[in-house]
Amino acid sequence: MAPVSLPPGFRFHPTDEELITYYLKRKINGLEIELEVIAEVDLYKCEPWDLPGKSLLPSKDQEWYFFSPRDRKYPNGSRTNRATKGGYWKATGKDRRVSWRDRAIGTKKTLVYYRGRAPHGIRTGWVMHEYRLDETECEPSAYGMQDAYALCRVFKKIVIEAKPRDQHRSYVHAMSNVSGNCSSSFDTCSDLEISSTTHQVQNTFQPRFGNERFNSNAISNEDWSQYYGSSYRPFPTPYKVNTEIECSMLQHNIYLPPLRVENSAFSDSDFFTSMTHNNDHGVFDDFTFAASNSNHNNSVGDQVIHVGNYDEQLITSNRHMNQTGYIKEQKIRSSLDNTDEDPGFHGNNTNDNIDIDDFLSFDIYNEDNVNQIEDNEDVNTNETLDSSGFEVVEEETRFNNQMLISTYQTTKILYHQVVPCHTLKVHVNPISHNVEERTLFIEEDKDSWLQRAEKITKTKLTLFSLMAQQYYKCLAIFF
């Protein structure tokens, strides 16, 4: 059958009800269709990209309509064979009922084409709507033939095809131009379903996020300013992208240029000045370690402190003391003219060896401890300054730095012995029996024969009652 051309300005856009009530119903019942615009093609023996060439109605709307005979998967079964040579059609969602004038006339099924074989197929943008006629719409002569044909609408959505798992995944980002045209890497348009207007292809690509890192030296602020305030984003909006593809894209790290860090101009002299200013207020009650910016890459000026056992001494030189500005501060004042003032120290500038026991002291800082430390510490002369020609006055400020070392105590675990319970049995001992017998024997001689017989009878009855009571008590305890 030759292709049919419509006059200019006409488009073939039938509704679901029109496709079923007119075209599909007339095809199954054997009635004549006025204009043959839908061809009969076995869709499950053709690939979807070959279907546009088999359509009788060429159109720029990228939608094609076909009558497809039903191909059963099994001879005795009702399942349809939807596998092609290069892939398969997979149903998505539930079948929707198509109604007309409050009565059901057919069903609509949505299918998506996958390349390869299940379950490792690759989803594509080819979508098919399969319409089937309800059995109530069949003529008596064509009863039971409602499943003989299906009317199919085939169109293509522009989506991002997922790569197989065994292949290397690389996502190319193509930036949209100002006019809002498509990008050539993914063929991504503003809408998932292609409209009547054709889109131009842009051949400009941006660097790949998956394989190439950004060069922070080559990227300036102007490169990133193009994204601010723009209505076009590097990626489509979330509701236009398939969920599966979006999740797979988020699994890859997108490397952005590092932030530019400006080093603050903080010199050693400023640090030492601030430390000296803080010393007057007694800040050195705790250990303070001075950090300099210039010694990060220069290991020559670093101070190495060897800490051994408690008997070893921690020795530092006066030169390093003045550089780091902690433990001790010495001020040397010189004068060319001799004065009558009595200097505190003459001639030699001394350096003290600080014992590590001073740092591991548990005593509270007070003046008595300072005097005791001054009496016990040894002073060794390591460097000598020539004092000929001027007098040297050294003001020495001492600080007692202490460290509190505490130990934690382990918890005690107490084990309790479990002893099984014991059963306690109680037996009632009738004490009144012996008392009454003794009373009876004492008064035997004083009473007559009748009285004695009466007393014996009462005694027997009393004994019998006591025995009965004891018997019932034992039964009660036993049960």
Curated annotation (Swiss-Prot):
Boundaries of every NAC domain copy: 6-157
Gene3D superfamilies: NAC domain
Domain notes: The NAC domain includes a DNA binding domain and a dimerization domain.
Record keywords: DNA-binding, Nucleus, Transcription, Transcription regulation
Protein name listed in UniProt: NAC domain-containing protein 45
Gene it is expressed from: NAC045
Signals that turn on the gene: Regulated by the transcription factor APL (AC Q9SAK5).
Record function comment: Transcription factor directing sieve element enucleation and cytosol degradation. Not required for formation of lytic vacuoles. Regulates, with NAC086, the transcription of NEN1, NEN2, NEN3, NEN4, RTM1, RTM2, UBP16, PLDZETA, ABCB10 and At1g26450.
